[in-house]
Amino acid sequence: MNAEPHGHPGEALLRSDRQPHIWCPECGIGTALSCFTEALVRSKLDLDKVAVVSGIGCTGRVAGYVHLDSFHTTHGRAIPFATGLKLANPLLKVVVFSGDGDLISIGGNHFIHAARRNVDLTVICVNNFNYAMTGGQVAPTTPLGAVSPTTPYGTFENSFSLPALAASCGAVYVARWTTLHVRQLIRSMETALAKRGFAFVEVISPCPTLYTRRNKLGSGLDWMRMLRDKTDVKNGADPRTVDIDFGGRITIGTFVDIEKPTLQDKIDESMKAALGEAYTRIDQAGTDRSERRALLDQ
């Protein structure tokens, strides 16, 4: 009896014409993308209304590898670009998928204010602790004491704790998983996609060519063993207590899961108070182009 062929769960969402990809062997970004496509399949979202926005960096190439409406934007500007998409068409499910350097360093200001405003975005950040595409330089996420080309004697700056940053700025969903914990990561991404508001998922990922090699952390398999042995699942943990120390244990789990009005909800409330029945949201005006244009011209 011939066995049935088994493809990737998200095969229809991946662009095989873009192979081979740019990611190094043992890099975790492919695993993060795989989890994302499976989460999308499980979410039952209308894929014609899903948009993926990425910035610059290794993770930023995700936008070019998916069979979705996707946008590869300038460095650090993925979130403001995504915010514009969402405000122009509130019916879209907009996902920002990028790396720690793009989202938290170059785009840190945008990250803070999007979370503060509670813009209805799903933000997935692959954190590999360095600027991998440009040579592994120190980043705001590099743990204290870790070695990089720009800190050859060890990093002397304190690093950001991304869950603490997202939660303190107002995110309604905050989680951290690793590229080893794929089942939990898929479920977390699926939950984030279903949330209304700024939903943030951090994905801890190896950078075998630069960060792990320079810090003598072994092979990709060694990194997986480290994630198995040095991670603690603590759902509901205070985000202020989940900092990552070089060589220390890593707390993972879902830390924040709340509901509150989104930026669009607040806009609607304000405009209805000012204009009453004269206010009609652009996505509720029908598909007739002239009708939409008339609303924009008012």
Give, region by region, the residue ranges found by the protein language model.
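Active-site diphosphate/adenylate-binding microenvironment
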Residues: 5-74
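Active-site-proximal loop->helix
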Residues: 108-113, 133-145, 165
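Short, hinge-like loop/turn segments at secondary-structure boundaries
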Residues: 69-70, 114, 139-143, 192, ...
